[in-house]
Regions:
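NTP/phosphate- and nucleic-acid-binding module
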Residues: 1-441
Protein backbone atom coordinates (compact mmCIF):
# COMPACT_ATOMS: atom_id res chain seq x y z
CA UNK A 1 0.00 0.00 0.00
CA UNK A 2 1.27 3.46 -0.90
CA UNK A 3 0.84 6.06 1.81
CA UNK A 4 -0.53 8.56 -0.73
CA UNK A 5 -3.47 6.18 -1.34
CA UNK A 6 -4.01 5.10 2.27
CA UNK A 7 -6.50 6.84 4.55
CA UNK A 8 -4.35 7.48 7.62
CA UNK A 9 -5.22 10.70 9.49
CA UNK A 10 -2.40 10.85 12.05
CA UNK A 11 -2.20 13.53 14.75
CA UNK A 12 0.97 15.26 15.95
CA UNK A 13 -0.38 16.24 19.37
CA UNK A 14 -1.95 14.18 22.14
CA UNK A 15 -5.76 14.59 22.34
CA UNK A 16 -6.57 16.29 25.64
CA UNK A 17 -9.39 13.89 26.56
CA UNK A 18 -7.29 10.73 26.14
CA UNK A 19 -6.05 9.70 29.58
CA UNK A 20 -4.13 6.49 28.91
CA UNK A 21 -1.38 5.58 26.46
CA UNK A 22 -3.43 3.25 24.26
CA UNK A 23 -6.26 5.75 23.82
CA UNK A 24 -3.81 8.54 22.91
CA UNK A 25 -1.86 6.41 20.46
CA UNK A 26 -4.91 4.85 18.82
CA UNK A 27 -6.23 8.35 18.11
CA UNK A 28 -2.86 9.78 17.06
CA UNK A 29 -2.03 6.85 14.77
CA UNK A 30 -5.37 7.12 12.99
CA UNK A 31 -6.69 3.74 14.16
CA UNK A 32 -9.96 5.03 15.60
CA UNK A 33 -12.20 8.07 15.86
CA UNK A 34 -14.87 8.60 18.49
CA UNK A 35 -18.47 8.60 17.27
CA UNK A 36 -20.19 9.10 20.64
CA UNK A 37 -19.52 8.29 24.30
CA UNK A 38 -17.81 4.90 24.42
CA UNK A 39 -18.44 4.20 20.72
CA UNK A 40 -15.71 4.35 18.07
CA UNK A 41 -15.31 4.04 14.33
CA UNK A 42 -12.36 1.93 13.26
CA UNK A 43 -10.34 3.38 10.38
CA UNK A 44 -8.23 1.31 7.92
CA UNK A 45 -5.15 0.99 10.15
CA UNK A 46 -7.29 -0.08 13.10
CA UNK A 47 -9.24 -2.58 11.01
CA UNK A 48 -5.98 -4.19 9.88
CA UNK A 49 -4.99 -4.65 13.52
CA UNK A 50 -8.41 -6.09 14.42
CA UNK A 51 -8.18 -8.48 11.47
CA UNK A 52 -4.75 -9.70 12.55
CA UNK A 53 -5.94 -10.30 16.11
CA UNK A 54 -9.01 -12.11 14.79
CA UNK A 55 -6.90 -14.30 12.51
CA UNK A 56 -4.79 -15.57 15.40
CA UNK A 57 -7.88 -16.19 17.53
CA UNK A 58 -9.74 -18.00 14.74
CA UNK A 59 -6.73 -20.16 13.82
CA UNK A 60 -6.36 -21.39 17.40
CA UNK A 61 -10.08 -21.67 18.16
CA UNK A 62 -10.64 -23.81 15.06
CA UNK A 63 -8.46 -26.48 16.70
CA UNK A 64 -11.09 -27.10 19.40
CA UNK A 65 -14.25 -25.29 18.28
CA UNK A 66 -16.48 -24.46 15.30
CA UNK A 67 -17.21 -20.92 14.17
CA UNK A 68 -20.77 -19.66 13.89
CA UNK A 69 -22.24 -16.16 13.72
CA UNK A 70 -25.10 -15.03 15.96
CA UNK A 71 -27.01 -11.75 15.61
CA UNK A 72 -26.38 -8.64 17.67
CA UNK A 73 -30.12 -8.19 18.36
CA UNK A 74 -31.75 -10.87 20.52
CA UNK A 75 -35.31 -11.67 21.59
CA UNK A 76 -35.84 -10.64 25.21
CA UNK A 77 -37.92 -13.75 25.94
CA UNK A 78 -34.94 -16.09 26.16
CA UNK A 79 -33.32 -13.73 28.67
CA UNK A 80 -36.51 -13.78 30.72
CA UNK A 81 -36.41 -17.59 30.72
CA UNK A 82 -32.88 -17.59 32.13
CA UNK A 83 -33.75 -14.95 34.72
CA UNK A 84 -31.13 -12.49 33.53
CA UNK A 85 -33.40 -9.99 31.79
CA UNK A 86 -33.89 -8.02 35.00
CA UNK A 87 -30.76 -9.20 36.80
CA UNK A 88 -28.34 -7.86 34.19
CA UNK A 89 -29.18 -4.29 35.11
CA UNK A 90 -28.90 -1.03 33.20
CA UNK A 91 -25.88 -2.17 31.18
CA UNK A 92 -28.30 -4.07 28.95
CA UNK A 93 -29.74 -1.96 26.12
CA UNK A 94 -33.44 -2.84 25.81
CA UNK A 95 -35.38 -1.89 22.70
CA UNK A 96 -38.81 -2.37 21.10
CA UNK A 97 -39.28 -3.23 17.44
CA UNK A 98 -42.16 -1.80 15.35
CA UNK A 99 -44.46 -4.56 16.62
CA UNK A 100 -43.69 -3.66 20.24
CA UNK A 101 -41.72 -6.85 20.75
CA UNK A 102 -39.07 -6.58 23.45
CA UNK A 103 -35.56 -7.01 22.07
CA UNK A 104 -32.06 -6.45 23.42
CA UNK A 105 -28.70 -5.50 21.95
CA UNK A 106 -26.73 -8.53 23.14
CA UNK A 107 -24.09 -7.96 25.82
CA UNK A 108 -23.28 -11.69 25.68
CA UNK A 109 -24.73 -14.84 24.11
CA UNK A 110 -25.24 -17.62 26.66
CA UNK A 111 -29.02 -17.62 26.21
CA UNK A 112 -29.03 -17.48 22.42
CA UNK A 113 -26.43 -20.20 21.88
CA UNK A 114 -28.21 -22.42 24.42
CA UNK A 115 -31.46 -21.98 22.49
CA UNK A 116 -29.66 -22.91 19.25
CA UNK A 117 -28.32 -26.04 20.91
CA UNK A 118 -31.68 -26.93 22.48
CA UNK A 119 -33.52 -26.69 19.16
CA UNK A 120 -30.99 -28.67 17.12
CA UNK A 121 -29.13 -31.23 19.26
CA UNK A 122 -30.97 -34.25 20.66
CA UNK A 123 -28.46 -37.08 21.22
CA UNK A 124 -25.45 -37.66 23.41
CA UNK A 125 -23.69 -38.82 20.23
CA UNK A 126 -23.40 -35.15 19.18
CA UNK A 127 -21.36 -34.30 22.28
CA UNK A 128 -18.97 -32.81 23.15
CA UNK A 129 -19.74 -29.65 21.19
CA UNK A 130 -17.97 -26.31 21.19
CA UNK A 131 -19.13 -23.27 19.20
CA UNK A 132 -17.58 -19.82 18.93
CA UNK A 133 -18.35 -16.57 17.17
CA UNK A 134 -16.93 -13.07 16.82
CA UNK A 135 -19.45 -10.26 16.99
CA UNK A 136 -19.93 -6.67 18.14
CA UNK A 137 -21.58 -6.36 21.54
CA UNK A 138 -23.00 -3.50 23.57
CA UNK A 139 -22.99 -2.82 27.30
CA UNK A 140 -24.25 0.55 28.46
CA UNK A 141 -21.32 1.38 30.74
CA UNK A 142 -22.20 4.07 33.27
CA UNK A 143 -18.79 5.72 32.75
CA UNK A 144 -17.21 4.71 29.44
CA UNK A 145 -13.54 5.70 29.51
CA UNK A 146 -10.04 4.87 28.35
CA UNK A 147 -11.05 4.64 24.70
CA UNK A 148 -11.82 1.11 23.49
CA UNK A 149 -10.46 -0.33 26.74
CA UNK A 150 -13.80 0.33 28.41
CA UNK A 151 -16.16 1.33 25.65
CA UNK A 152 -19.86 0.65 25.31
CA UNK A 153 -19.56 -1.16 21.98
CA UNK A 154 -16.82 -3.76 21.58
CA UNK A 155 -15.79 -6.68 19.38
CA UNK A 156 -15.65 -9.98 21.22
CA UNK A 157 -14.93 -13.62 20.61
CA UNK A 158 -17.11 -15.84 22.75
CA UNK A 159 -17.17 -19.63 22.76
CA UNK A 160 -19.56 -22.08 24.42
CA UNK A 161 -19.06 -25.72 25.36
CA UNK A 162 -21.72 -28.41 25.79
CA UNK A 163 -20.90 -31.69 27.55
CA UNK A 164 -22.69 -34.74 28.92
CA UNK A 165 -21.26 -34.60 32.44
CA UNK A 166 -19.10 -32.48 34.70
CA UNK A 167 -15.90 -34.44 34.07
CA UNK A 168 -16.15 -33.90 30.32
CA UNK A 169 -17.15 -30.27 30.85
CA UNK A 170 -14.06 -29.59 32.95
CA UNK A 171 -11.93 -31.12 30.19
CA UNK A 172 -13.56 -28.73 27.70
CA UNK A 173 -12.77 -25.88 30.11
CA UNK A 174 -9.15 -27.04 30.36
CA UNK A 175 -8.79 -27.28 26.59
CA UNK A 176 -9.90 -23.66 26.31
CA UNK A 177 -7.51 -22.70 29.12
CA UNK A 178 -4.56 -24.09 27.13
CA UNK A 179 -5.94 -22.65 23.88
CA UNK A 180 -5.98 -19.16 25.43
CA UNK A 181 -2.39 -19.50 26.59
CA UNK A 182 -1.40 -20.28 23.00
CA UNK A 183 -3.47 -17.42 21.56
CA UNK A 184 -1.85 -14.81 23.76
CA UNK A 185 1.61 -16.29 23.26
CA UNK A 186 1.21 -15.90 19.49
CA UNK A 187 0.36 -12.24 20.08
CA UNK A 188 3.60 -11.76 21.98
CA UNK A 189 1.83 -11.37 25.32
CA UNK A 190 2.81 -12.87 28.68
CA UNK A 191 -0.66 -13.78 29.92
CA UNK A 192 -1.36 -14.83 33.50
CA UNK A 193 -4.41 -16.96 34.35
CA UNK A 194 -5.83 -15.90 37.72
CA UNK A 195 -8.74 -17.15 39.80
CA UNK A 196 -11.67 -14.82 39.20
CA UNK A 197 -15.18 -13.93 40.26
CA UNK A 198 -17.95 -15.30 38.02
CA UNK A 199 -19.95 -12.03 38.02
CA UNK A 200 -23.29 -11.87 36.15
CA UNK A 201 -22.37 -14.88 33.98
CA UNK A 202 -22.63 -17.15 37.02
CA UNK A 203 -21.11 -20.53 37.85
CA UNK A 204 -18.55 -21.82 40.32
CA UNK A 205 -15.31 -21.95 38.32
CA UNK A 206 -13.68 -19.03 36.55
CA UNK A 207 -10.28 -17.75 35.42
CA UNK A 208 -9.30 -14.39 33.99
CA UNK A 209 -6.35 -14.09 31.64
CA UNK A 210 -4.54 -10.82 32.31
CA UNK A 211 -1.45 -8.96 31.15
CA UNK A 212 0.49 -6.72 33.51
CA UNK A 213 0.20 -3.01 32.65
CA UNK A 214 0.42 0.16 34.72
CA UNK A 215 -2.94 1.39 33.43
CA UNK A 216 -4.77 -1.86 34.19
CA UNK A 217 -8.03 -1.50 36.11
CA UNK A 218 -7.65 -4.91 37.75
CA UNK A 219 -5.15 -5.80 40.42
CA UNK A 220 -3.55 -9.23 40.59
CA UNK A 221 -1.67 -11.06 43.30
CA UNK A 222 0.56 -13.89 42.12
CA UNK A 223 3.73 -15.91 42.49
CA UNK A 224 6.48 -14.65 40.18
CA UNK A 225 7.11 -18.27 39.14
CA UNK A 226 4.01 -18.13 36.95
CA UNK A 227 5.89 -15.67 34.71
CA UNK A 228 8.59 -18.29 34.12
CA UNK A 229 6.13 -20.76 32.59
CA UNK A 230 5.80 -21.45 28.89
CA UNK A 231 3.17 -23.25 26.85
CA UNK A 232 4.14 -25.51 23.98
CA UNK A 233 2.11 -27.04 21.18
CA UNK A 234 -0.21 -29.63 22.64
CA UNK A 235 -2.53 -32.38 21.44
CA UNK A 236 -5.94 -31.04 22.47
CA UNK A 237 -7.42 -34.56 22.39
CA UNK A 238 -4.86 -35.87 24.88
CA UNK A 239 -6.62 -35.47 28.23
CA UNK A 240 -3.50 -36.18 30.25
CA UNK A 241 -1.40 -33.55 28.45
CA UNK A 242 -4.13 -30.91 28.60
CA UNK A 243 -4.98 -31.50 32.26
CA UNK A 244 -1.30 -31.62 33.26
CA UNK A 245 -0.69 -28.27 31.54
CA UNK A 246 -3.59 -26.66 33.41
CA UNK A 247 -2.49 -28.22 36.71
CA UNK A 248 1.01 -26.81 36.22
CA UNK A 249 -0.17 -23.28 35.45
CA UNK A 250 -2.66 -23.25 38.33
CA UNK A 251 -0.17 -24.71 40.82
CA UNK A 252 1.24 -21.21 41.38
CA UNK A 253 -0.84 -18.77 43.39
CA UNK A 254 -2.55 -16.20 41.16
CA UNK A 255 -5.71 -14.33 42.04
CA UNK A 256 -7.70 -11.27 41.16
CA UNK A 257 -8.43 -8.76 43.91
CA UNK A 258 -12.06 -9.94 44.11
CA UNK A 259 -11.12 -13.55 44.93
CA UNK A 260 -7.95 -12.85 46.93
CA UNK A 261 -7.47 -14.84 50.13
CA UNK A 262 -4.83 -12.68 51.79
CA UNK A 263 -3.82 -15.25 54.39
CA UNK A 264 -3.47 -17.98 51.76
CA UNK A 265 -1.47 -15.65 49.50
CA UNK A 266 1.00 -14.73 52.26
CA UNK A 267 1.33 -18.35 53.36
CA UNK A 268 1.88 -19.87 49.91
CA UNK A 269 4.04 -17.24 48.21
CA UNK A 270 7.49 -16.33 49.49
CA UNK A 271 8.00 -12.64 50.15
CA UNK A 272 10.54 -12.28 47.34
CA UNK A 273 8.20 -13.94 44.84
CA UNK A 274 5.09 -11.87 45.51
CA UNK A 275 3.78 -9.79 42.62
CA UNK A 276 1.04 -7.24 43.23
CA UNK A 277 0.46 -5.34 40.00
CA UNK A 278 -2.15 -3.62 37.94
CA UNK A 279 -3.30 -5.72 35.02
CA UNK A 280 -5.63 -5.70 32.03
CA UNK A 281 -8.12 -8.50 31.55
CA UNK A 282 -7.86 -9.93 28.02
CA UNK A 283 -9.79 -13.19 28.39
CA UNK A 284 -12.21 -14.94 30.73
CA UNK A 285 -13.31 -18.56 31.25
CA UNK A 286 -16.50 -19.67 33.03
CA UNK A 287 -17.87 -23.09 33.94
CA UNK A 288 -21.50 -22.89 35.06
CA UNK A 289 -22.87 -26.41 34.75
CA UNK A 290 -26.61 -26.40 34.06
CA UNK A 291 -27.29 -22.75 34.96
CA UNK A 292 -28.59 -22.08 31.43
CA UNK A 293 -29.37 -25.58 30.17
CA UNK A 294 -32.06 -26.14 32.83
CA UNK A 295 -34.23 -23.04 32.22
CA UNK A 296 -33.67 -23.17 28.44
CA UNK A 297 -34.17 -26.94 28.17
CA UNK A 298 -30.82 -27.81 26.62
CA UNK A 299 -30.82 -31.58 27.03
CA UNK A 300 -29.90 -34.78 25.19
CA UNK A 301 -30.89 -38.42 25.43
CA UNK A 302 -28.07 -40.52 26.90
CA UNK A 303 -27.14 -44.17 26.23
CA UNK A 304 -29.77 -45.39 28.66
CA UNK A 305 -32.49 -43.38 26.96
CA UNK A 306 -32.68 -40.87 29.80
CA UNK A 307 -32.90 -37.13 29.25
CA UNK A 308 -29.82 -35.33 30.61
CA UNK A 309 -29.31 -31.58 30.88
CA UNK A 310 -25.94 -30.66 29.41
CA UNK A 311 -23.12 -29.02 31.33
CA UNK A 312 -21.90 -25.75 29.86
CA UNK A 313 -19.05 -23.28 29.89
CA UNK A 314 -18.45 -19.94 28.18
CA UNK A 315 -15.17 -18.36 27.16
CA UNK A 316 -14.54 -14.77 26.06
CA UNK A 317 -11.73 -12.74 24.50
CA UNK A 318 -12.15 -9.02 23.90
CA UNK A 319 -10.80 -8.50 20.37
CA UNK A 320 -11.06 -4.70 20.30
CA UNK A 321 -9.89 -4.49 23.92
CA UNK A 322 -6.84 -6.59 23.01
CA UNK A 323 -5.76 -3.99 20.45
CA UNK A 324 -5.55 -1.43 23.27
CA UNK A 325 -3.98 -3.87 25.74
CA UNK A 326 -1.20 -4.76 23.30
CA UNK A 327 -0.40 -1.05 22.88
CA UNK A 328 -0.26 -0.63 26.67
CA UNK A 329 2.39 -3.35 26.76
CA UNK A 330 4.27 -2.44 23.56
CA UNK A 331 4.95 1.28 23.22
CA UNK A 332 7.61 3.91 23.81
CA UNK A 333 7.82 7.70 23.77
CA UNK A 334 7.63 7.73 19.95
CA UNK A 335 4.55 5.57 19.51
CA UNK A 336 3.38 1.99 19.14
CA UNK A 337 5.81 -0.96 18.92
CA UNK A 338 3.59 -3.68 17.42
CA UNK A 339 4.56 -7.36 17.67
CA UNK A 340 4.96 -8.64 14.11
CA UNK A 341 1.89 -10.90 14.19
CA UNK A 342 -0.35 -7.95 15.10
CA UNK A 343 1.23 -5.11 13.11
CA UNK A 344 -0.97 -3.57 10.39
CA UNK A 345 2.04 -3.67 8.06
CA UNK A 346 5.19 -5.71 8.59
CA UNK A 347 7.46 -3.42 6.55
CA UNK A 348 7.55 0.33 6.05
CA UNK A 349 9.50 2.09 3.30
CA UNK A 350 10.48 5.74 3.67
CA UNK A 351 11.83 7.71 0.73
CA UNK A 352 13.84 10.40 2.49
CA UNK A 353 14.16 12.59 -0.63
CA UNK A 354 10.97 12.44 -2.63
CA UNK A 355 12.17 14.39 -5.69
CA UNK A 356 15.42 12.47 -6.03
CA UNK A 357 15.05 10.18 -9.07
CA UNK A 358 17.45 7.55 -7.77
CA UNK A 359 15.70 7.40 -4.38
CA UNK A 360 12.33 7.08 -6.11
CA UNK A 361 13.60 4.33 -8.42
CA UNK A 362 15.12 2.26 -5.60
CA UNK A 363 12.11 2.81 -3.33
CA UNK A 364 9.66 1.69 -6.03
CA UNK A 365 11.79 -1.36 -6.86
CA UNK A 366 12.01 -2.49 -3.23
CA UNK A 367 8.29 -1.89 -2.74
CA UNK A 368 7.38 -3.93 -5.83
CA UNK A 369 9.65 -6.82 -4.87
CA UNK A 370 8.40 -7.02 -1.28
CA UNK A 371 4.78 -6.93 -2.48
CA UNK A 372 5.51 -9.78 -4.91
CA UNK A 373 6.71 -11.82 -1.93
CA UNK A 374 3.31 -11.34 -0.31
CA UNK A 375 4.55 -9.11 2.50
CA UNK A 376 2.34 -6.35 3.88
CA UNK A 377 4.17 -3.11 3.07
CA UNK A 378 3.42 0.57 3.59
CA UNK A 379 5.46 2.79 1.26
CA UNK A 380 5.47 6.44 2.31
CA UNK A 381 5.66 8.13 -1.08
CA UNK A 382 4.25 11.48 0.06
CA UNK A 383 5.96 14.74 -0.74
CA UNK A 384 6.59 15.44 2.95
CA UNK A 385 9.71 16.12 4.98
CA UNK A 386 11.84 13.14 6.03
CA UNK A 387 11.34 13.94 9.71
CA UNK A 388 7.56 13.84 9.40
CA UNK A 389 7.65 10.53 7.54
CA UNK A 390 9.99 8.89 10.04
CA UNK A 391 7.89 10.13 12.95
CA UNK A 392 4.74 8.63 11.41
CA UNK A 393 6.45 5.27 10.88
CA UNK A 394 7.44 5.17 14.56
CA UNK A 395 4.01 6.39 15.65
CA UNK A 396 2.08 3.66 13.84
CA UNK A 397 4.62 1.06 14.95
CA UNK A 398 5.66 -0.77 11.79
CA UNK A 399 8.17 -3.44 12.95
CA UNK A 400 10.71 -3.14 10.09
CA UNK A 401 11.45 0.21 8.47
CA UNK A 402 13.54 0.67 5.32
CA UNK A 403 15.02 4.16 4.95
CA UNK A 404 16.22 5.21 1.50
CA UNK A 405 18.17 8.45 1.14
CA UNK A 406 20.61 9.95 -1.40
CA UNK A 407 23.62 9.89 0.93
CA UNK A 408 23.30 6.20 1.76
CA UNK A 409 22.66 5.27 -1.87
CA UNK A 410 25.92 6.96 -2.87
CA UNK A 411 27.63 4.40 -0.65
CA UNK A 412 25.40 1.58 -1.93
CA UNK A 413 23.57 0.86 1.32
CA UNK A 414 20.12 1.29 2.84
CA UNK A 415 19.16 1.65 6.50
CA UNK A 416 16.97 -1.04 8.09
CA UNK A 417 15.44 -0.17 11.46
CA UNK A 418 13.84 -2.61 13.91
CA UNK A 419 11.09 -0.66 15.68
CA UNK A 420 11.01 -2.38 19.08
CA UNK A 421 14.78 -2.23 19.67
CA UNK A 422 15.39 0.97 17.63
CA UNK A 423 18.45 -0.79 16.19
CA UNK A 424 19.48 0.51 12.75
CA UNK A 425 21.65 -1.55 10.38
CA UNK A 426 23.25 -0.61 7.08
CA UNK A 427 22.35 -3.18 4.40
CA UNK A 428 23.66 -3.24 0.84
CA UNK A 429 21.05 -2.39 -1.79
CA UNK A 430 21.43 -5.80 -3.43
CA UNK A 431 20.83 -7.65 -0.15
CA UNK A 432 17.94 -5.66 1.33
CA UNK A 433 15.16 -7.95 0.04
CA UNK A 434 16.87 -11.11 1.32
CA UNK A 435 17.65 -9.43 4.65
CA UNK A 436 14.04 -8.37 5.19
CA UNK A 437 12.83 -11.88 4.33
CA UNK A 438 15.21 -13.36 6.92
CA UNK A 439 14.20 -10.87 9.60
CA UNK A 440 10.45 -11.32 9.33
CA UNK A 441 9.25 -14.22 11.43
Amino acid sequence: MKRSNFFLPTLKENPVDAKIVSHRLMLRSGMIRQSSAGIYSWLPLGVKVLNNIESIVIEEQNKISQQILMPTIQDANIWKKSGRYEDYGKEMLKILDRNKREMIYGPTNEELVTEIFSNNVMSYKDLPMNLFHIQWKFRDEIRPRFGVMRGREFLMKDAYSFDLNEEEAIFSYNRMFVNYLNIFKKMGLQSIPVKADTGPIGGDLSHEFVVIAETGESKIFCDSKVLEQNINDIDYDDKTSVNNAVNLWTSFYASSEETLDKEEYLALVKEGNRIEKNAIEVGHLFYFGDKYSLPLDASVINKEGKRIFVKMGSYGIGISRLAAAIIEVFHDEKGICWPENIAPFKVGIVNLRQNDKNCEKVSESIYDNLCKLGLSVLYDDRNEGAGSKLADMDLIGIPWQIRIGPNSLKNNYIELKQRQSSEVNEISVSEIINEVQKKIT
